[in-house]
């Protein structure tokens, strides 16, 4: 989860009623290209630029890869651009676009303001026409995504994952966003939605090496680190559709896999996933999952000053999904 606010503070850790517009709005070039200095820009429903919200206060982006992307901000009630804050108008942050969903009039401490909640334009994928295809055999993510997005105004972008899987969606499923979110559960990849050009990427979960460093007394204001073995597993029994096992795929013909990379303790979990009909696909996915489950999880929550807007420090810029270097000598974090 990544949160930004106007003070350039980030928050990290490891881990309504919506109207669907079948015709995507026209595009104009973004006014800003860096998040650290960007102001909010508002457009009408047809994509015509209305103005820059210079007086928008406390803008907060809350983002999590492939699942959460919302924007909240407030605006003084007497702001002359208040008239642009209409439900279903579009707010742009650099090259990311959001539909205005909720507008509240608030009186707090003698101050009148509008409090605005927005959702990324890709949220509307959950309110589209029913899908034509619900089943795929030995298909790549690109093939499945193309079928899911067909007729939505969105298209497949960059796909780095080339493995093949079988996938059967439940009959009557009309939520294409929910269908897309099945892919990370079956393949090893991450969904990235590009609201600037209405494309969806499916990338390997490796992250970009940003080159940025977060260091105490430099740009780190607060940090909280947690290490946990609450959900640690070292032995995994896997079952697919109709209680299919992985015995045909396992090199030793076993119905389970093991990984003792962190501890020799035997901690067993049984998993059944009806989406898998091929034992080799289930085995491959299980090996990957256990490589993660068999080691402690770590989460880092930090408040960080964004230095990238300062002269000579543009290399300190980072974004959601990037790899960053974290150092705190006193806490032994490196």
Task: Go through the PLM ranges and name each one.
Residues 57-81, 222-334:
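An acidic/polar, Gly/Ser/Thr-rich interaction patch typically located in mid-to-C-terminal regions
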Residues 36, 104-125, 160-237, 242:
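Short beta-strand-centered interaction patches in the first periplasmic/extracellular domains
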Residues 1-34, 326, 333-334:
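Viral virion structural and adsorption modules
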Residues 87-95, 164, 321-329:
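Short conserved beta-strand and strand-loop elements enriched in small hydrophobics
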Residues 84-90, 172-173, 217-219, 321:
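Glycine-centered loop/turn motifs
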Residues 30, 34-66, 217-225:
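Solvent-exposed edge beta-strands and adjacent loop segments
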Residues 142-146, 177-180, 235-236, 283, ...:
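Extracytoplasmic/secreted envelope proteins and their assembly/folding machinery
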Residues 76-159:
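Surface-exposed cap/loop segments at beta↔alpha junctions
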